[in-house]
Each structure stands twice: as structure tokens, then as C-alpha cells.
């Protein structure tokens, strides 16, 4: 399995303060985002994805999914979030304020396994289309990731991690 840590999201900072956040190459993040992994856990996720690339080169008919889960929660935690959304953009900035319900994560795994129409190795970000922020995503990005280029404007509370690739490949 993989996670969004394959790009080095959480493991790079000793403490998440303004001068310690390593911004990604661009927003929204996607399957082509490079890594800035420095810690053993993130490096292991990144290496696992490269092993998937190698398997796919040798066996191009195989379907290999690196599922990049982010903030996977159950109903109880969702209720807490609804009651107290994040207003400080530095809170959970290392996870890019995204989340996924455990049922949706499980559904993505089942579909990836059951769907026989795709081949090769794919990196799939598995996350909701919105954030857990009480402020617009663009405002949070401007506060925390001031130097990261934007490939497009993100409306309202849109996730700064694109899940378009997973939608295109497995639905």
C-alpha cells in the first residue's frame, strides 16, 4: 500500500511552522507530483510505488494500484469535524486539509480490484473532493504554501489534491 506520504507530505518537518513547511511542486497535487520524502516511512511509500513501476514494466498486462489514502476516518470523527471545522490553516496543513471516509476508501479498493478494464501501475489519490476547512482552500494555500504554484484556481472548499486520475481510470 501507499499513502499521500509517498510525496513526503507529513514526515519532512520536525514541527509544522511557517518556516518548516516544504511546499509541493504545485497545486492541486496529482499522480505526477514529485516527492520530497526524507523520513523512512515516506521513503518506503515512495520506493513501493517505484517497485510497482518495475512490476508494470515487466508485466504490462497487470493492474497495479498505489492507493494514496489521506485522513481516513469513520462516522464518529466526521461528526466531530462537522461540529468544529478547521479555521487555522496551519492545522493539518501537512495533510493538505483533506480526508476520506473509511467506506469510500474500501469502495475504491474493491473497484480497483474488480475492474478488469485497466492495466499498468497507477498512483491514485483517494480523498474527498472538498476539505475540512472553515475557510476557502485558496485562502489556506495563500497562508501556508505561499511559494507553491497553482495549476488552476480551486473554488470554495475544493481539495488541493486532485482525484481526477482515479475517476478517469477506475471511476
Which sequence ranges carry the predicted segments?
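Glycine-rich "substrate-gating" loop/helix at the edge of Rossmann-like oxidoreductase active sites
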Residues: 38-42, 70-71, 75, 90-103
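Catalytic helix-loop patch of NAD(P)-dependent Rossmann-fold dehydrogenases
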Residues: 6, 11-59
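Conserved beta-loop-beta element that borders a ligand/cofactor-binding pocket
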Residues: 2, 49-74
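Glycine/proline-rich active-site loop of Rossmann-fold NAD(P)-dependent oxidoreductases
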Residues: 58-63, 74-90, 112-122
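Mid/C-terminal beta-alpha module of Rossmann-like enzyme folds, strongest
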Residues: 108-163
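Short, flexible, mixed-charge acidic loops at enzyme active sites
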Residues: 12-26, 78-87, 140-142
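Active-site beta-alpha turn of Rossmann-fold NAD(P)-dependent dehydrogenases/reductases
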Residues: 1-2, 26, 38, 68-70, ...
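Active-site proximal helix/loop that lines the substrate pocket
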Residues: 3-9, 74, 131
Amino acid at each position: 500500500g501507499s499513502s499521500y506520504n509517498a510525496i513526503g507530505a507529513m514526515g519532512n518537518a520536525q514541527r509544522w511552522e511557517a518556516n518548516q513547511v516544504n511546499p509541493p511542486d504545485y497545486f492541486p497535487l496529482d499522480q505526477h507530483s514529485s516527492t520530497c520524502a526524507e523520513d523512512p516511512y515516506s521513503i518506503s511509500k515512495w520506493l513501493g510505488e517505484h517497485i510497482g513501476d518495475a512490476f508494470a514494466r515487466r508485466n504490462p498486462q497487470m493492474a497495479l494500484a498505489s492507493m494514496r489514502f489521506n485522513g481516513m476516518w469513520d462516522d464518529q470523527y466526521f461528526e466531530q469535524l462537522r461540529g468544529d471545522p478547521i479555521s487555522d490553516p496551519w492545522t493539518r496543513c501537512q495533510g493538505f486539509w483533506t480526508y476520506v471516509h473509511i467506506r469510500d476508501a474500501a469502495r475504491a479498493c474493491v473497484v480497483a480490484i474488480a475492474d478488469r478494464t485497466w492495466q499498468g501501475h497507477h498512483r491514485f489519490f483517494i480523498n474527498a473532493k472538498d476539505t475540512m476547512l472553515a475557510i476557502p482552500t485558496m485562502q489556506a494555500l495563500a497562508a501556508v504554501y505561499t511559494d507553491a504554484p497553482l495549476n488552476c484556481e480551486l473554488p470554495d472548499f475544493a481539495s488541493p489534491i486532485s482525484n481526477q486520475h482515479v475517476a478517469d481510470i477506475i471511476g
